[in-house]
């Protein structure tokens, strides 16, 4: 926990100080209202600081293929296109301009879970505005529940002696700053709690996410994110790794389309943060895409 606080301070404090100086290339007229730091409520795998506006629905489809290379990839698997690591379908809704909720269903990777339903609540505490706030701050909390058939082996985390063991939780604070009209940076202190883990693992896992966005044109942007896990046991250090992703984002009014490259097979904070085991250097990374469609029902 001490290491987590120290690293958060090292990243967050310089960002806050720098954020107090507006870009010389940005006029006050440009930022006459709250600034949108990202174009979507997600960066790639993880949440962004953004929320849906009041009365807006968003239908989302997230898809992750199999390994491009390595022992499970290559030409025989059409570089991962023959396989499906995970897929999520979700509906999200903006209750107010600051508060939104979402619900989804994921296939699951099977490492360790399959057949998951999830939900979250997200609230924007403050938005970046000129002369008011140099940063945006958003809080999000959620949970996932697996309804897969319990494993008969009592030594597996999918044995589920009790129904509550099927639940996992996460909580995050997202802090972001928009630099001029091209760049954005976000830090995301994260806590993931799992009700049932291996005897050599830990229930509570702290992580720090760092995300960035560079706008290329009025329609395209490059985005990236990395989640570093802390307080891991020896079990976690040998069996799991950190999640990273890069993506090309294409956005239009009402639509957001992202083509991504990531080493994480699972979708959702309770999956990709604690259970990413694939390694970039072994070719265990995959293509994926996310499609979001916003609409209003009157």
Protein language model regions, located:
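Structural motif marking the loop-to-transmembrane transition
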Residues: 3-4, 183, 217
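A mid-sequence, solvent-exposed acidic-amphipathic segment
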Residues: 186-231
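Transmembrane beta-barrel domains of Gram-negative outer membranes and organellar outer membranes
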Residues: 20-161, 166-171, 176-193, 214, ...
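Generic secretory/membrane-interface signal
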Residues: 14-15, 115, 219
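Intrinsically disordered, low-complexity segments enriched in polar/charged small residues
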Residues: 10-11, 182
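Initiator methionine at the very start of the polypeptide chain
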Residues: 1, 19-20
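Sec-dependent signal peptide recognition
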Residues: 2-10
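Hydrophobic h-region of N-terminal signal peptides that target proteins for export
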Residues: 11-19
